[in-house]
UniProtKB/Swiss-Prot annotation:
It holds the Pfam family Globin. The gene is HBB. The modification S-nitrosocysteine is found at residue 94. It comes from Lagothrix lagotricha. Belongs to the globin family. This is Hemoglobin subunit beta.
Length: 147
């Protein structure tokens, strides 16, 4: 559960309505893989991830980034039940993929940076603070099965 004020929830929802999930998802996942290269080990089947340009132009990275942000969108629609919303993904990432749950926090922070880059002045400190709460809540929900 994420505790947002009415104003924070409105700001998150308003900005998210303008997000191009295809573009932002691929960019966020790509930046995660470039900035934190050890995360690439979970994506061996994605082909060439040898350089930043290769990562950022990789169609599998873009497609998976879109999928990730689709799940994030579902979370935004269920802020009062993030653990339930992400239960299956938490189980998958914990039991089958063995993803370090710290990676969820890293991806959330990268997503906030990408949103700031795309929205500039519209991504005010207040909007950033609200998104930091949301990505922290999503990361906690995804890490739930690890506990």
């Amino acid at each position: 559960m994420v505790h947002l004020t009415g104003e924070e929830k409105a700001a998150v929802t308003a900005l998210w309505g303008k997000v191009n999930v295809d573009e932002v998802g691929g960019e966020a996942l790509g930046r995660l893989l470039v900035v934190y290269p050890w995360t690439q080990r979970f994506f061996d089947s994605f082909g060439d991830l040898s350089t930043p340009d290769a990562v950022m132009s990789n169609p599998k990275v873009k497609a998976h980034g879109k999928k990730v942000l689709g799940a994030f969108s579902d979370g935004l629609a269920h802020l009062d039940n993030l653990k339930g919303t992400f239960a299956q993904l938490s189980e998958l990432h914990c039991d089958k993929l063995h993803v370090d749950p710290e990676n969820f926090r890293l991806l959330g922070n990268v997503l906030v940076c990408v949103l700031a880059h795309h929205f500039g002045k519209e991504f005010t400190p207040q909007v950033q603070a609200a998104y930091q709460k949301v990505v922290a809540g999503v990361a906690n929900a995804l890490a739930h099965k690890y506990h």
